[in-house]
């Protein structure tokens, strides 16, 4: 409070700048409630008109079921169907009214039915456990609601159900409420997740220990500073990841500092002085108490954007007031090029280096870097068909992590005929350090990727590891432990620190250069890790 909305024109300009600078293929519009943004439908259509040719998909955070419309779904699926999350939050209409989410079950089912009809096969649902006034019946209603949502699909749909534990927060109507303790949270979760056992439902939940700790700090006071320092000294790190959270160590920190964590999870009296009372959020204490009473009666407090001011105390209607964005009067025109016939692709072959720090990029990471760089370059790309369109790029080989190369190759398809010299100029400005286009040629239409037969490597070691006798013994062998037959290889040992390795390639079961060197010269893992391997060429 008060509601403040950014202008759609500003959002369009910022997204254009961000996409051009990063080359990302997905854009997320982040807000607490995306469906409540006044210009959402207009903004989505304009973003998709601009981004569909570049195959940029749009995703939204969790939506209230009553704000999901066919128009929003139609825009979201224009490139690909990104994840869709609905937030029923509670299993019954009664409990949703308590938290001022007046969502009848039929509205939730209608939204799910629309999403499945629009082609989504997976929906994500979010529920909270331990809400104020919650009863076992409210929790028991969650699995049946999930199954009803599944039944709104005519196909074999999937549901991902996330279960979170309620944590009272300061400056809210529930800031006085008790938070469920660790054992209660485990009990709530046990009953619900058992009811969600279904081959088409995947349930996820937050760690009860994380909820307990977050609850303590959410309504804590300055005494928790010494607890935080003690926990750090005891070795607590990265506690947001459940595998790193050490609850016993946190309990030790509370014990050493003499602070009772359960003190912060208890029910508070409305007359109690709260640790955050000296902070003025604008919302009066009287308004929060009145909202608390309305919640327990199941009475809705309407949205002040639609039903007028509710006198929360934030707005003075002079300097501070609602700031809503008015959608343009007319819908944006779709770009003419979007409906044009697809262009005839033009293929180019690029030769590039992978040196220095770039050698630590795995092949999939390198592919991702090229995809983003191609988008950032502004070149007219051609995209693949299917669920997840990507730039049409074909890599001729996958270089092992840690190996450098002077001459890797890939083929890329463009929508226009360009001078080959223009491609290195466009790409080298945006490729990561160590990756550089050194040659580009235009290919005939039907030319297949080359079948590589030989790779030549230059290998250097900081210590004398390459024994000429070991190389000669290897070349004289009939078999090799890594494969069923000895790979065709040529070794030239210049001195014990330098060698040149020629590896003959086959259609399958090729030996990795590191494996070959390790077995030929009986190297340890540490010795192999210190080698500097440079791929000179492939033919």
Identify what each model region corresponds to.
Residues 165-170, 381-415:
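Short, charge-patterned binding micro-sites
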Residues 16-164, 168:
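Conserved SAM/AdoMet-binding glycine-rich loop
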Residues 406-458:
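Ordered, amphipathic secondary-structure segments that act as subunit-interaction surfaces
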